[in-house]
């Protein structure tokens, strides 16, 4: 029984059932080549497709729409004007806009059109193959100047290294979720990152499977409001990708590896798959990228003289300053418990969500579930990692490791990241162990630790670089931010330091 939740009935997992019941209307401004395939695919999943090619028509339709898909596959200057008019109309009626930047990595004109559409600030979801997503990120990012990075291959693109990181960074840059498809699909909402197997390789040999995915994601996005209290946008879209990939694999079992037969079998599979299969296959995997842990702030009321208001102010300042992760650690004499702790955790969750900051709960697994935090961090003496994973599902799971001995007895298979420390002498934790120094990170990695690490304990702006150079992807800080005269400025210093590597 979760003491923070009054209604103990577990919500039913019914994404596909809900989609078919709601029958969302998806307006498709799409590639001439794939209209029929896209329409049939949307009908198969339980959505209602309608194709639109002029503003006069769209004005009548948009009031009924659950989502708008803009696919630039067959591009003309006249269509660009229509895309922009469609975006204005959709924004007026609060209809989510899904943009498929087909082939934008293959030509300057296509890329310029995509960038103009993104710069309207109205796109709700960007879905492209990994080469397309990388092209958009490279064009928008002032930090990515690597001219030797792998380019896409033709219009269909190729597998791109570091696609999880690119999806995360681009989602934060354009303030909307990004789906990057390849041999492994990645989705990020700017806070979380998820990986999903793409399906069968034959899907890339059938014209329209990528374009149909954009339409399917539009339909899913159109019903997200029904699930926003239980699933992050990223995790919800990851389930849509899992469904699509499962349909591809199921179709191959029926059709064999034959592109012509596959198309029919694929539409059938989209129609027949249900929520039970989607859950049982467990294809969604949480991914943690180094950027998420770069500046990791840990705090609770014990660090603010038991002043809740001050804690909330500091956390908001820290989020504005650029922390990438916040851990709510409420421990010690006089700290909050029960309903008061729950209410504060919810307030902190809202702040972190506002700034797309990863929100972690320290030790309290039940609280993490109750407030739908992004993750939980546990110590060596807390609940075993397998039990934690079984309870929190796809949430981020962090574990503290202080020594090589602890590493060898910890089942890191169930964790996503590790906190190593204390790096230096610390006054923030009265029960802290003896300092192990930054070299402990390298020692643990030499012994086989391959999870992302953050150093914690006594870290200041003066000694943080040594921790990062030792192999940590980030620094976890308490006092240097919580007790700073200007927390915002303190965070900026840590951010600049970490970014300089």
Each language-model region and where it sits:
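Glycine/charged-rich beta-loop-alpha catalytic/anionic-binding loops adjacent to active sites
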Residues: 20-25, 190-203
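Conserved phosphate/ATP/ADP-binding segment of small-molecule kinases
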Residues: 108-193, 340-415
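Conserved N-terminal beta1-alpha1 strand-loop-helix module at the mouth
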Residues: 20-38, 43-49, 56, 289-375, ...
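Conserved post-catalytic alpha-helical subdomain immediately downstream of the catalytic base
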Residues: 216-268, 470, 479
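Charged C-terminal helix
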Residues: 7-10, 245-289, 497
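Short glycine/threonine-rich catalytic loop with a Thr-x-Gly-x-Asp
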Residues: 200-217, 233-234, 259, 456-457
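Ribokinase/PfkB-type carbohydrate-kinase core domain
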Residues: 2-127, 131, 138-141, 153-173, ...
């Amino acid at each position: 029984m979760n003491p923070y939740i009054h209604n103990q009935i577990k919500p039913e997992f019914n994404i596909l059932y809900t989609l078919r019941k709601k029958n969302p209307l998806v307006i498709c401004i799409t590639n001439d080549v794939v209209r029929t395939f896209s329409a049939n695919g949307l009908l198969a999943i339980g959505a209602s497709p309608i194709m639109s090619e002029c503003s006069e028509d769209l004005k009548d339709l948009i009031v009924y729409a659950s989502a708008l898909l803009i696919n630039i596959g067959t591009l003309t200057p006249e269509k660009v004007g229509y895309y922009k008019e469609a975006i204005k109309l959709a924004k007026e009626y609060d209809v989510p806009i899904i943009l498929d930047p087909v082939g934008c990595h293959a030509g300057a004109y296509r890329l310029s059109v995509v960038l103009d559409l993104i710069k309207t600030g109205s796109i709700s979801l960007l879905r492209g193959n990994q080469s397309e997503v990388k092209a958009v990120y490279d064009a928008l990012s002032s930090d990515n100047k690597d001219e030797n990075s792998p380019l896409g291959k033709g219009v269909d693109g190729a597998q791109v290294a570091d696609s999880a990181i690119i999806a995360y960074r681009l989602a934060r840059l354009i303030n909307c979720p990004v789906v990057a498809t390849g041999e492994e699909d990645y989705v990020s909402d700017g806070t979380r990152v998820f990986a999903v197997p793409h399906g069968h390789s034959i899907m890339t040999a059938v014209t329209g499977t990528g374009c149909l995915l954009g339409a399917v994601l539009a339909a899913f996005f159109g019903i997200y409001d029904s699930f926003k209290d239980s699933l992050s946008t990223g995790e919800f879209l990851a389930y849509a990708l899992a469904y699509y990939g499962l349909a591809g694999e199921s179709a191959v079992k029926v059709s064999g590896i034959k592109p012509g037969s596959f198309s029919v079998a694929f539409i059938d599979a989209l129609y027949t798959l249900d929520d039970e299969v989607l859950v049982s296959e467990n294809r969604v995997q949480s991914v943690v990228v180094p950027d998420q842990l770069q500046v990791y702030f840990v705090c609770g009321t014990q660090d603010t003289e038991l002043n809740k208001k001050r804690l909330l102010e500091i956390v908001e300042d820290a989020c504005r300053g650029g922390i990438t992760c916040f851990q709510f650690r409420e421990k010690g004499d006089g700290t909050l418990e029960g309903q008061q702790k729950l209410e504060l955790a919810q307030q902190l969750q809202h702040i972190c969500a506002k700034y797309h900051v990863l929100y972690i709960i320290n030790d309290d697994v039940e609280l993490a579930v109750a407030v739908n935090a992004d993750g939980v961090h546990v110590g060596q003496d807390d609940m075993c990692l397998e039990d934690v994973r079984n309870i929190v599902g796809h949430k981020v799971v962090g574990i503290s490791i202080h020594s090589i001995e602890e590493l060898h007895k910890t089942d890191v298979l169930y964790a996503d990241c590790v906190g190593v420390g204390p790096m230096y002498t610390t006054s923030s934790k009265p029960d802290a162990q003896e300092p192990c120094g930054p070299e402990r990170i390298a020692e643990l990695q030499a012994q086989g630790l391959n999870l992302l690490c953050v150093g914690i304990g006594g870290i200041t702006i003066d000694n943080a670089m040594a921790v990062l150079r030792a192999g940590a992807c980030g620094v976890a800080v308490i006092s240097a931010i919580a007790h700073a005269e200007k927390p915002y400025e303190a965070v900026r210093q840590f951010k600049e330091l970490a970014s300089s590597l």
